[in-house]
Amino acid sequence: MRKIYIHICAVLLGLAVISCNHTNQRQQTGNSGTAISKKALKDSTVVKQTVNTAAQVYAKPEVPVLCYHRISDGPKSEYRVSPETFSAHMKILADSGYHSILPDQLYDYLFYNKTLPEKPVMITFDDSRAEHAEIAAPVMEKHGFRGVFFIMTITYNKKNYMTTDQIAQLEKAGHTIGLHSWDHTMVTKYKEEADWQKQVADPKKKLEGIVGKAVEYWAYPNGVYDHNGAEELSKYFKLSFSLYSKRDSAVPLQSVRRMIVPECTSQGLLKSMHRTFGR
């Protein structure tokens, strides 16, 4: 009887040891799983993108930004180049190794330090003239260039100006559509909330309906920069473009400088770019 009792105790002790070992194994497995899970979480953590301060944006080398207005034959003017001259300008840019960039690329370069192609240049157009779609765009596309077209929404579907279909087609072809106000009223005259609604908020919404995407870039009417206006524009746009005005170190993203391109030779264009932007 005593032998049977001892045997039963031994069996029970063995079962207890097995149970403890199994529990420890489960705990170890669980701890290991937790450790793996934490490691995986750590490895999958997205590193936040570094952004530049206003001072850092202001310190970055400028990119040449060209601005064309009318592309037609007629009296010589700072705001007009002939179709032949425009074609020659695009050819010399291509032959000289320039690469056209769009505002998204410029913004990423200024704000996030993204790399730009060698010899970047931005080609922009103000006032939504019909010849921008009918003459300029095909010439640029022939050289692999894309441009930026700033639209006054009061003009579309009117004589000598782009139609809504042309605006949408430019966007589909890889160009960028920006806003140039409703009726070309200068930002310095936006005094009331109603002015901002009429010249910026409402036209922006209408233009977005035409192109089917956000409109994130602005060109100052008449190229006239305004510091107070720039602060307000930063609520609507990533970048705003002026003409010749000095950049504002407080809001450099809203004071991107452009150069008006007049009737001039191809070599004259390159010299003006170098003189204005240093490249």
Model features per residue range: what roles?
Residues 1-8:
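Bacterial N-terminal signal peptides that target proteins for export
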Residues 16-19:
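C-terminal motif of bacterial Sec signal peptides marking the signal peptidase cleavage site
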Residues 131-132, 158-159:
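Secondary-structure boundary/capping motif
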Residues 58, 137-145, 162-180, 234, ...:
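Acidic (Asp/Glu)-rich catalytic clusters
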Residues 159-161, 189-190:
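Short, well-ordered secondary-structure micro-motifs
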Residues 24-124, 129-131, 184, 188-279:
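C-terminal active-site subregion of NodB/CE4 polysaccharide deacetylases
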Residues 64-67, 99-103, 122, 141, ...:
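Short, well-structured secondary-structure segments
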